[in-house]
């Protein structure tokens, strides 16, 4: 569409900032861990020291930590308590929280949507952490950026960087 000035129409020009890719992203407010793939099994793997450091880093940075799982609540709460103790995880969402305990519904991203709802944020302010590449599809179904991360590489800064890079790539 052209610009009309003094009775004449001329071609509209775009400004450089209209053509540039977005270089900012929303502030990371929460990291949602997939308990089924990202959290170690205490009985077999032992407590993950690196995971505790990562969660403490997120907690100190003011970033909420949430956990989702397709397993029953009692089992997941026990796992989280053994790994992280009490008070560091903002919310735990399990298959028991769904209207119908259906694994297919849980794998469609509904657990992540429910976690976002409980935290009161949108997918733009969260990052999902999974422990396997196959598990990346579930948070993506909920519109969440997701990363497959080795817990030894996880910190508040690395989560913020991964979140920012993911949204910038989406805008490009």
What residue ranges belong to the model's regions?
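Conserved ATPase-coupling elements of RecA-like P-loop NTPase cores
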Residues: 41-47
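Conserved phosphate-coupling serine/threonine residues in phosphotransfer and NTP-handling enzymes
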Residues: 69-71
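Asp-based, Mg2+/Mn2+-dependent phosphohydrolase catalytic module
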Residues: 1-37, 52, 56-59, 63, ...
